[in-house]
Amino acid sequence: MQNLPDVLASSATPKTLQDVLAVTTDTCIAISDALKQGSLAGILGMAGNENVQGEEQKKLDVISNDMLKDALISCPSVRAIASEEEDYIVPANTDGEYFIAFDPLDGSSNIDINAMVGTIFSIYRQTGDKPATEADFLIPGKEQVAAGYVLYGPSTMLVLTTGDGVNMFTYDPTKRVFTLTHEKVQVAKDTQEFAINMSNQRFWSANMQSYVNDLVKGKEGSRGKNFNMRWVAAMVGDVHRILCRGGIFIYPWDNKDPSKAGKLRLMYEANPMAMLLEQAGGKAHTHTQRILDIQPEAIHQRVAVILGAANEVDKCLSY
């Protein structure tokens, strides 16, 4: 079986990008080790401060962010990083080739109950002869050269695309390497599973409420078939399920908090997941445009997200 370095070396992936991916995934292995320690290492619970999103940080949010930041800014191929947990971008090496944006610990509210979490990352090639600025980082998702996530579940898995399909790697703790276990993953175009936080239904648009009501009505409704609902409360877990067995994930626009009409971050969550889904034959949209076509206006910009099985995304958009 091939491990991650072998797969990248046998592809058209540039050596400098291989280096960035190696640093990223090696750090995720260290994060996985830290997660396994849990209460034994005193790393659960709140850190006692908020991030730029106005969210209370968990101790492991801060720990995982610092681990990735320190490792990546030391990588000669990295020009700058942006993190969900950092107020501003962090310039690294002026002669580096790549920007990397990441959510160091997606689903961190799950940490204290020992449920699924993950690290999401997005990589762009962007060279220059001056220190990087936030304006340099505002690149549409269609320009990503790689995207992926590491899922910390019963096994630790890496899901990765470099623009030539989606591969899944399982971490082998005896060898401390990611080994290729699922190649060229494809998402079925039709589905009978959906993932959405139903507690927010009253805040959605009328069109979205109508769509979800039709799913819930099942065979007795206009869809003529039953649907199951799933919700992990971590985007990384819900998207992983869709890549493994199909479905649609929706975090729609809502009016619960007008300052955060979209919940998920474009740069750290929506763009990398959209690239993965499209590479696997799915679709990713906001309800007004393709996610990968969005011109970012700020590194912490939020958007609505509808992604998954191509035909079901189209059906949702038709409402």
Swiss-Prot record:
Q: In which pathway does it act?
A: Carbohydrate biosynthesis; gluconeogenesis
The cofactor note reads: Binds 2 magnesium ions per subunit.
- Positions binding Mg(2+) 2 in this chain are 103, 106, 269
Concerning its family, UniProt says: Belongs to the FBPase class 1 family.
Which of this chain's residues are annotated to bind substrate?
Answer: 106-109, 197, 263
Which Pfam families has this protein been placed in?
FBPase, FBPase_C
Write the record's keywords in alphabetical order, separated by commas. Answer: Carbohydrate metabolism, Cytoplasm, Hydrolase, Magnesium, Metal-binding
What protein am I looking at? Answer: Fructose-1,6-bisphosphatase class 1
Q: Which domain of life is it from?
A: Bacteria
Q: What is its main location?
A: cytoplasm
Q: Tell me the InterPro entries matching this sequence.
A: FBPase_C_dom (IPR044015), FBPase_class-1 (IPR000146), FBPase_N (IPR033391), FBPtase (IPR028343)
* GO BP, sorted A to Z: fructose 1,6-bisphosphate metabolic process; fructose 6-phosphate metabolic process; fructose metabolic process; gluconeogenesis; sucrose biosynthetic process
Q: Could you say which enzyme class this protein belongs to?
A: hydrolase
UniProt keyword Magnesium present = yes
Which residues does the record give as Mg(2+) 1 binding sites?
84, 103, 105
Q: Which HAMAP family match?
A: FBPase_class1
Enzyme Commission numbers on file: 3.1.3.11
Write out the GO MF terms. fructose 1,6-bisphosphate 1-phosphatase activity; magnesium ion binding
What does the annotation say about its assembly with partners?
Answer: Homotetramer.
GO CC aspect terms: cytosol
Gene name for this UniProt entry: fbp
Reaction catalysed?
beta-D-fructose 1,6-bisphosphate + H2O = beta-D-fructose 6-phosphate + phosphate
Cofactor(s) for this protein? Mg(2+)
- Compartments where located: Cytoplasm
* CDD domains listed in its UniProt record: FBPase (cd00354)
